[in-house]
Design a protein with these regions (language model features):
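Arginine/glycine-rich "motif VI" loop of SF2 helicases in the C-terminal RecA-like domain
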Residues: 20-24, 81-84
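NTP-dependent small-molecule kinase module
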Residues: 71-76, 80-139
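A glycine- and Lys/Arg-enriched "phosphate-lid" helix/loop adjacent to the NTP-binding pocket
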Residues: 1-13, 21-73, 120-127, 135
Length: 139
């Protein structure tokens, strides 16, 4: 829809949902894989030239390229409207797939390291119950 009120409300809903997730201790990371128009064209051509890649191609992709600038404006607006400390966007240069993948993987790793996750503690009472259950399963 072209209605800006529709999109404004949609973006507010997304931001509210992400805030709810973060409030409930869900870590939200968002990645925008920023592909240049030239690289997109190269990838489309490769898909068209290789029969084993035809399944990845949709004719609508070529038509939609005509609206590249409009999409960029919309993406930038969406990123601005939904970026928050509790739900950050990471804009990743994606023309070179291995580099993009490395940046995403490092970001996830750093986030997990900062979270310092650990297995939950098991109470002594529960540990005893589990031992009894294990004993009942032995032959």
């Amino acid at each position: 829809p072209q209605d800006t009120a529709f999109w404004d409300e949609r973006l507010r809903s997304i931001a509210a949902h992400e805030r709810h997730l973060a409030f409930n201790r869900t870590v939200v990371l968002k990645f925008w894989l920023n592909l240049s128009q030239d690289e997109q064209k190269r990838r489309f051509l490769r898909r068209l030239q290789r029969p084993d890649k035809h399944w990845k191609f949709d004719e609508a992709d070529v038509r939609e390229r005509e609206h590249w600038d409009d999409y960029m404006v919309a993406y930038q607006a969406a990123i601005r409207a939904t970026h928050a400390d509790w739900a950050p966007w990471y804009v990743i240069p994606a023309d070179h797939k291995p580099t993009a993948r490395l940046i995403v993987a490092r970001t996830i790793r750093q986030t997990l390291e900062a979270m310092d996750p650990d297995y939950p503690e098991v109470s002594a009472e529960r540990a005893q119950r589990l031992q009894r259950l294990a004993g009942s399963l032995k032959l």
